[in-house]
Amino acid sequence: MAARLCCQLDPARDVLCLRPVGAESRGRPFSGPLGALSSSSPPAVPTDHGAHLSLRGLPVCAFSSAGPCALRFTSARRMETTVNAHQFLPKVLHKRTLGLSAMSTTDLEAYFKDCLFKDWEELGEELRLKVFVLGGCRHKLVCAPAPCNFFTSA
């Protein structure tokens, strides 16, 4: 069972704030760059990675100031992947990212399914893209031994 997150775009800071679903107001937001097309190399995860929050199914990188690896990968200008569609992947993702300002609040699963998988389902490449997104994270989970999987329903 993976953790469920609410995504909320903060247009003032141009970041996507992530909060566990049902968390009290004391929970701090997890932010990651959304519009900035940065490098796909994940920065070091801070020592205070939020393990005290006991969120099942979240990789340690979810508590990084740069945000979860999967979100960083979607906004990367260059994605070093085995996905054959890499030559047009950034353009499609950039186009879809520009439309995020209309979003209010949604969960991470719906965000990825809409932004990443819709076009590739039609091309029959969803599985390879899914493997890239899930397999790209090199960080360990905080409280669960299962593989990093943002798409499993709670």
UniProtKB/Swiss-Prot annotation:
Residues 68-117 are annotated as: Mitochondrial targeting sequence. One of its GO terms (biological process) is symbiont-mediated activation of host NF-kappaB cascade. It is found in: Host cytoplasm; Host nucleus; Host mitochondrion. Transmembrane segments: none annotated. It comes from the Viruses. Signal peptide: none annotated. InterPro entries: Transactivation_prot_X. A fraction may be phosphorylated in insect cells and HepG2 cells, a human hepatoblastoma cell line. Phosphorylated in vitro by host protein kinase C or mitogen-activated protein kinase. N-acetylated in insect cells. One of its GO terms (cellular component) is host cell mitochondrion. Its main location: host cell. Multifunctional protein that plays a role in silencing host antiviral defenses and promoting viral transcription. Does not seem to be essential for HBV infection. May be directly involved in development of cirrhosis and liver cancer (hepatocellular carcinoma). Most of cytosolic activities involve modulation of cytosolic calcium. The effect on apoptosis is controversial depending on the cell types in which the studies have been conducted. May induce apoptosis by localizing in mitochondria and causing loss of mitochondrial membrane potential. Belongs to the orthohepadnavirus protein X family. May form homodimer. May interact with host CEBPA, CFLAR, CREB1, DDB1, E4F1, HBXIP, HSPD1/HSP60, NFKBIA, POLR2E and SMAD4. Interacts with host SMC5-SMC6 complex and induces its degradation. Interacts with host TRPC4AP; leading to prevent ubiquitination of TRPC4AP. Interacts with host PLSCR1; this interaction promotes ubiquitination and degradation of HBx and impairs HBx-mediated cell proliferation. This is Protein X. It comes from Hepatitis B virus genotype D subtype ayw (isolate Australia/AustKW/1991) (HBV-D). The gene is X.
